[in-house]
Design a protein with these regions (language model features):
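SAM-dependent transferase fold signal centered on methyltransferase-like domains
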Residues: 2-432
Length: 432
């Protein structure tokens, strides 16, 4: 049973008169035990991992603050909204999608919020006021919220391409201390193939670099940093996630009030094509850009990308909190364990991703990563095993970790020439 709000065109709500819903004929999908129908909406099963991350931090936020009001401005079939409602136990979820054909489908999926869970004995009137559906332009919805001072704990903007129009309004419609979940699928800008598009959409001039997929995350965060600064706010990433299908770049940001932009984590990345060394540069050091390698300098041998985010991609404490909650929910049991809603494969992937995010959060790691095959190519040696190489780097006092973006790479503050030297002393077998 759905609920139709009679007071406005195109607005459906759980807080009004009940009307029967038209049936949507579609095979039922399931994520982590939550069933839903897709209908004519776009749905990608591979993105369920990113939805897992969003649900976990939403639940952690509710535990920490006692409040979770969610605005999902590009809902599609509503799988994210339903999971926020049922799994993160959101107090209220507003699901919006501009497509008129999805309204009944959204209502059908969100009506699961009226069902009794295993521990509930009764449903009060407030349980029927936990969700709302609209079919408005996402940009308009966000601006209206800011104008009415109707702020949310978490705003999910699942956009595609290089559409950053909603980034600023989303930051303006979230509570101080709240979360904004941003998405981009602009692999061409991340790869430096559309530099002027990147400049207009993200405020960064992006040159081709060998860690393009990390650039995709950093330019998206950098865009949010710039938008927040114009509103006397700051944003810092709770976690950032790259997925190869698409590609898809996602980041969950914490929004705080601050009157001045602190630019230590907002700057430029410099890369030397001759030696393969990259470094982070502050605004104050732009006039001193150079590479200290012994190779003769040629025009274009040193390239600069930015301004963008050059700080940590994740908040270690928050990711550890997400990990603990995922373990409590049985989402990351040991491989081989299985619950009704979790396959061993899903559990292993989520567990490994959270572990790598914690590794990537260690202090001292710069932007970018070094692919193992590049070390072998530049040093003219067989490629060392990644794990052995990371152990060797840490023994030498360098920060080093895996990369969740590129499994054949390491993140380290060790200079490239030292990486090559250490590569000679590591176990020389080809990485699989």
């Amino acid at each position: 049973m759905g609920y139709l709000q009679m007071g406005g065109i195109g607005t459906f709500s759980a807080m009004a008169l009940p009307v029967p819903l038209a049936p949507v004929k579609m095979l039922i999908q399931e994520e982590r035990g939550v069933s839903f129908q897709v209908g004519p909406a776009f749905y990608r099963r591979q993105s369920s991992l990113a939805r897992d991350l969003g649900i976990l931090i939403a639940a952690v936020h509710r535990q920490q603050t006692g409040s979770l009001r969610v605005l999902d401005v590009m809902s599609g079939c509503g799988v994210r909204a339903v999971r926020y409602l049922l799994q993160a136990r959101a107090d209220f979820v507003w699901a919006n999608d501009a497509c008129n054909q999805l309204t009944d489908l959204l209502a059908q999926n969100l009506s699961q919020g009226h069902s009794l869970d295993e521990k509930s004995e009764a449903v009060g009137e407030e349980d029927f006021e936990r969700w709302r559906i609209t079919r408005e332009d996402a940009h308009k919805v966000l601006l209206d919220c800011a104008l009415r001072k109707e702020y949310y704990d978490l705003i999910d903007v699942d956009s595609f391409g290089s559409d950053t129009l909603c980034v600023g309004p989303a930051i303006g419609a979230v509570k101080y201390g709240g979360l904004v979940y941003l998405t981009s699928t602009d692999g061409l800008c991340a790869g430096g193939r559309r530099r002027h598009n990147a400049l207009s959409s993200y405020g960064a001039f992006v040159n081709p670099m060998p860690f393009a997929n990390e650039i995709g995350l950093r330019m998206l965060i950098g865009c949010a940093v710039r938008e927040a600064a114009t509103r006397n706010m700051t944003v810092t990433p709770i976690f950032s996630n790259y997925a190869y299908h698409g590609p898809v770049f996602r980041t969950m940001l914490r929004v705080e009030s601050r009157k001045r932009l602190v630019n230590k984590d907002y700057g430029f990345i410099v890369y030397c094509k001759r030696c393969g060394q990259s470094q982070d540069i502050q605004f104050e050091d732009l006039g001193d850009i150079a590479c200290c390698c012994a190779y003769p300098k040629e025009k274009g041998s040193v390239v600069v990308t930015g301004p963008l985010w050059i700080g940590p991609l994740h908040d270690r404490n928050q990711v550890e909190g997400m990990t603990e909650l995922a373990r409590e929910w049985g989402w990351i049991n040991s491989v081989g364990a299985r619950s009704i809603s979790n396959s061993p494969v899903d559990m292993h992937i989520l567990k490994e991703l959270l572990e790598v995010m914690v590794d990537e959060s260690q202090p001292g790691l710069p932007s970018g990563y070094v692919r193992m095959d590049q070390i072998g190519k530049r040093g003219k040696v067989r490629v060392p095993r990644r794990k052995d190489f990371i152990d060797r780097l840490q023994q030498e006092g360098y920060a080093a970790s895996r990369s969740h973006i590129e499994p054949r790479a390491v993140k380290t503050n060790c200079p490239m020439d030292q990486c090559i030297e250490l590569g000679y002393g590591s176990r020389s077998i080809v990485i699989q």
